Regions:
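Active-site-proximal beta-strand elements of phosphoester/diester hydrolases
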Residues: 129, 166-170
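N-terminal beta1-alpha1 cap of cysteine-dependent amidohydrolase-like domains
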Residues: 1-97, 103-104, 116-123, 134, ...
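Beta-propeller blade-edge signature
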Residues: 125-127
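Post-Walker A helix-loop "phosphate-sensing" segment adjacent to the P-loop in P-loop NTPases
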Residues: 107-111
Length: 191
């Protein structure tokens, strides 16, 4: 499978922006060809890929107004990437921030969590995952269905089969058990 994957934006010395991709992604997708996307420049021809992954990292801007955005270049790039994938019917996997951004870009809403998840282990229906987020889905974008919620009702996995999109609230690339990794890879194959 040929996979394009967005990278997190980081600020280093002298206020210079850098694009970064965790090495865990290479381990998670070791059987596939991975093409990192720096979130700058031209949107790739998405129909040349079997899957686009919008990764985590970078906090979301204000969830009500979408202002105070510290990563406007990444947000605009990923918004255009979603539009292009819809035109070419290229499947998208949104992970953590990627899931929340995808939901927002397609008409869903979010709310702040009373108690943010900071490396918090949460129980899903058949397995546990470790989550890192301070916002949660309030309403899913049209066409998405809840696949997994945690024991507090936080949506951790949603699917839109008609648009070929899967949103995951945790980081499957960091999962230590093979069941969780296999579960996500199997869902990707249904898109």
């Amino acid at each position: 499978m040929k996979i394009a994957i967005s990278m997190e934006m980081t600020r280093k010395l002298r206020d210079t922006w850098h694009a970064a991709l965790s090495h865990e992604w290479y381990d998670f997708l070791s059987q596939h060809d991975i093409i990192p996307l720096s979130c700058h420049g031209k949107i790739p021809k998405t129909d040349e890929f079997d899957l686009i992954i919008m990764t985590g990292g970078n906090d979301m801007p204000d969830i009500k107004t979408w202002r105070d955005n510290n990563y406007p270049v990444r947000d605009e790039y990923e918004r255009q990437l979603i539009q292009q994938c819809q035109l070419t019917r290229t499947p998208i996997l949104g992970v953590c921030r990627g899931f929340h951004f995808m939901n927002w870009a397609l008409g869903g809403t979010h709310t702040s969590m009373d108690t943010p998840y900071d490396s918090t282990t949460v129980q899903l229906s058949t397995f546990e995952v470790v989550c890192h987020h301070s916002i949660q889905i309030a309403t899913l974008a049209p066409g998405f269905e809840v696949v997994q919620q945690d024991n507090k009702g936080v949506v951790e996995l949603a699917l839109n089969k008609s648009k070929r999109m899967l949103g995951v609230g945790w980081h499957p690339e960091r999962a230590v058990n093979t069941h969780t990794r296999t579960y996500i890879l199997d869902l990707i194959n249904t898109l």
